[in-house]
Amino acid sequence: MLTLSKPISAGQAQAYHKSEFANAKENYYTEGERVRGEWQGELATRYGLRGEVNEEQFARLSEGQHPQTGEALIRRQQAHEYINEHGETVRAMEHRAGWDATFSAPKSVSLTALVGGDNRVREAHRESVRVALDEMERYAQARIGGNAVAQTTGAWAVAKFEHDSSRPVDGYAAPQLHTHAVIFNVTETAEGKTRSLQAQELYKTQQYATAVYRSELAAHLQRLGYEVERGAHGQPEIKGYTREYLDASSPRRQQIEARLEEQGRRGAGAAQIAAHRTRDPGSGRT
C-alpha cells in the first residue's frame, strides 16, 4: 500500500533525514544496520545523483537548490506569520521540500522477509517499489503558474529509505517492511526550466501506484514459488499465515483499527488520519 504525506517543509525533511529516515534505530531486524538511502528518478540522473543518498545533497534539494552546486532552482518561500480574515495569527509554511510516499509491504510479506529471513522477498519489495515510482514519475507535472496548464515532464528526483519495523506500540516494534520515498518538489520542463511539482497530479496517481506495487509484488512472489492470495484490502498475501497470527503480529494496525471503531469511520483516508493521531510522540517517523 502507498500512503502520501502532506507537503513537508525543508526543515522537516532535513530533521526526518537525520533522526529517522537514515537512522539505524529504525531497523530492528537487521541488527541496527545503518539505513542507506538510494536515489531514483530521471531528474536525479540529470543531476548526477546515483547510488547512496548523501546528506548534503538531500539537504540542498529539500531547500530547492541544485544538489551538486547549491544553486537556487526554486524561488524559496520563507515562513512568515500573518493575520487572516478571522483575526487569527497564521504561520505560513516555508518552502515545500516535497512529499513522503511510503510503500508498506503486506504483513505476511514482512514476516517472510524479516522473521523468515528470505531476502529474496525483501528484494521483491524493493523492485516493486522501484517500478511503482517509475510509473508515478511518468505523470509528474510542473506548475507553470497563473492560468497556464500544468506541463507533464515525467521527471523527478526521489530519495528512498527502507525500514524494517513499524512504529513501536508499548515498546514493541513489529516487523514491517516499508520504504519511505521522499519526492522532492522540483522538476524540469521540456524547455529546461526548473519548476515546482504539481501536487494535484501526484495525489491522483496514488491509487494507481498502489495497484502497480501490489501487482508487481504478487508476480515476484509467485516467481519465487510462493502461493499468493488476495487479502482483505486487496493486497497480495503469502499463503500459510492465519488471520489470527497476522493480527497478533500487527499491534500498530490493531491500534489504528480501534481508533476507527471509536470514531465510527472507515476507509483508507480515515485510516491514514487515525495513524497520525495514534502515534507515540516519542517514537520515530515510520
Task: State what each model feature region is.
Residues M1-T286:
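Intrinsically disordered, flexible peripheral segments
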